[in-house]
Amino acid sequence: MLTIKDIHALEVMDSRGNPTIQASVILSDNTKASAIVPSGASTGKREALELRDNDKTRFLGKGVLRACENVNSVIKHHLIGLEATNQAFVDERLRALDGTPNYANLGANAVLGVSMALARASAKALNLPLYRYLGGANALTLPVPMLNIINGGTHANNSIDFQEYMIMPLGFESFKEALRASAEVYHTLKKLLDEKNQLTSVGDEGGFAPNFNNNVEPLEIISQAIEKAGYKLGEEIALALDVASSELVDEHFNYHLKGENKILDSHELVAYYKELVAKYPIVSIEDGLSEDDWEGWAFLSKELGRQIQLVGDDLFVTNASILQKGIEKNVANAILIKPNQIGTISETLETIRLAKHHAYQCVISHRSGESEDSFIADFAVALNTGEIKTGSTARSERIAKYNRLLEIEHELKGGIYIGKELFKHG
């Protein structure tokens, strides 16, 4: 029986230059594997707690030495000797050790690092790819990427209110071809921005961060880039938005679009989205309303839920009990899956199972503070979720996930690229 022999954590850096945890697990056969935990910029207030040191003399208070020490002492002490391949049991032990609903004691960053590293070590010891270990024989589907090519909101220092403008390459036969087309659109977009004397600096997730007069102009120029790159807008490559509207809302559920000098209530904002969807081939809107605006979400779902994908990120925070509330209220039809919002791989799997049971799409997602760790690429294939959101075709911490998916596609001798089949169930 494979057991856990040793566990340790190290403070390393993420893509924003902030500290994060690298956890390593060593098994009884001396197999070793590590995992680096990501970190978000715009976070849902119901997310599991990311433990920071708050020592202003180090990393402006963002150090993670306390979380590392929790791994190196408490977690290590209680997990050594446990069966390594019983992921659910180990993850439950981690939850019990912490004793709070949101990992306020040990830190979700400490717990997730160990959970990820354990899965990776067990897969390695069994000589299995991570996607096969987690997903079994049915892990065959390559996801449609949601590529963030223009950044706004909290991910960029510009005048755009919406956080992400994305492209989805649906009309292709393979992940490789879908990614190639997306890269060509990205480079074409850069040329168009250069021609307009717009900034081509990039945001946290590799998308460009230009200044526009309103939130519609990015849709226009992305549409132009798709067509100029030689692809059919809407048929081969569609559009998607992450509004991150919890960053725009006030206590009265009015939404402040500062880039357009507008203040809209929930119903007015939904009407605005309907205009955009009618004019552009937008197939997905994430966090279209605030995480607390359940009434607004119900209206949005009623108005657009049969037409496009409505993704809850801050709304659901990868939490099965909150998702259950959404299901009961007929809110949204998709959920963003971020393991660090909930704490362990097993809890993440529980949320995915619930979502799939109720025909909610699952989008496996990175965070804005990332690393070279490509765990979520394997995770998306393992769970056949059909969608992955992991940034643009720039910045090596984003490319690491795409390159891993290319490797997996090659290993699977093509696998199944879901493409246009993604939304056919609806």
Swiss-Prot record:
<keyword id="KW-0460">Magnesium</keyword>
<keyword id="KW-0456">Lyase</keyword>
<feature type="binding site">
    <location>
        <position position="286"/>
    </location>
    <ligand>
        <name>Mg(2+)</name>
    </ligand>
</feature>
<feature type="binding site">
    <location>
        <position position="163"/>
    </location>
    <ligand>
        <name>(2R)-2-phosphoglycerate</name>
    </ligand>
</feature>
<keyword id="KW-0963">Cytoplasm</keyword>
<feature type="binding site">
    <location>
        <position position="367"/>
    </location>
    <ligand>
        <name>(2R)-2-phosphoglycerate</name>
    </ligand>
</feature>
<dbReference type="GO" id="GO:0006096">
    <property type="term" value="P:glycolytic process"/>
</dbReference>
<feature type="binding site">
    <location>
        <position position="368"/>
    </location>
    <ligand>
        <name>(2R)-2-phosphoglycerate</name>
    </ligand>
</feature>
<dbReference type="GO" id="GO:0000287">
    <property type="term" value="F:magnesium ion binding"/>
</dbReference>
<keyword id="KW-0479">Metal-binding</keyword>
<dbReference type="GO" id="GO:0000015">
    <property type="term" value="C:phosphopyruvate hydratase complex"/>
</dbReference>
<keyword id="KW-0964">Secreted</keyword>
<dbReference type="GO" id="GO:0009986">
    <property type="term" value="C:cell surface"/>
</dbReference>
<keyword id="KW-0324">Glycolysis</keyword>
<feature type="binding site">
    <location>
        <position position="242"/>
    </location>
    <ligand>
        <name>Mg(2+)</name>
    </ligand>
</feature>
<dbReference type="Pfam" id="PF03952">
    <property type="entry name" value="Enolase_N"/>
</dbReference>
<feature type="active site" description="Proton donor">
    <location>
        <position position="205"/>
    </location>
</feature>
<dbReference type="InterPro" id="IPR036849">
    <property type="entry name" value="Enolase-like_C_sf"/>
</dbReference>
<feature type="binding site">
    <location>
        <position position="313"/>
    </location>
    <ligand>
        <name>Mg(2+)</name>
    </ligand>
</feature>
<comment type="pathway">
    <text>Carbohydrate degradation; glycolysis; pyruvate from D-glyceraldehyde 3-phosphate: step 4/5.</text>
</comment>
<comment type="similarity">
    <text>Belongs to the enolase family.</text>
</comment>
<dbReference type="InterPro" id="IPR020811">
    <property type="entry name" value="Enolase_N"/>
</dbReference>
<feature type="binding site">
    <location>
        <position position="389"/>
    </location>
    <ligand>
        <name>(2R)-2-phosphoglycerate</name>
    </ligand>
</feature>
<feature type="binding site">
    <location>
        <position position="338"/>
    </location>
    <ligand>
        <name>(2R)-2-phosphoglycerate</name>
    </ligand>
</feature>
<dbReference type="GO" id="GO:0004634">
    <property type="term" value="F:phosphopyruvate hydratase activity"/>
</dbReference>
<comment type="function">
    <text>Catalyzes the reversible conversion of 2-phosphoglycerate (2-PG) into phosphoenolpyruvate (PEP). It is essential for the degradation of carbohydrates via glycolysis.</text>
</comment>
<dbReference type="InterPro" id="IPR029017">
    <property type="entry name" value="Enolase-like_N"/>
</dbReference>
<dbReference type="InterPro" id="IPR000941">
    <property type="entry name" value="Enolase"/>
</dbReference>
<dbReference type="Pfam" id="PF00113">
    <property type="entry name" value="Enolase_C"/>
</dbReference>
<dbReference type="InterPro" id="IPR020809">
    <property type="entry name" value="Enolase_CS"/>
</dbReference>
<protein>
    <recommendedName>
        <fullName>Enolase</fullName>
        <ecNumber>4.2.1.11</ecNumber>
    </recommendedName>
</protein>
<dbReference type="GO" id="GO:0005576">
    <property type="term" value="C:extracellular region"/>
</dbReference>
<dbReference type="InterPro" id="IPR020810">
    <property type="entry name" value="Enolase_C"/>
</dbReference>
<feature type="active site" description="Proton acceptor">
    <location>
        <position position="338"/>
    </location>
</feature>
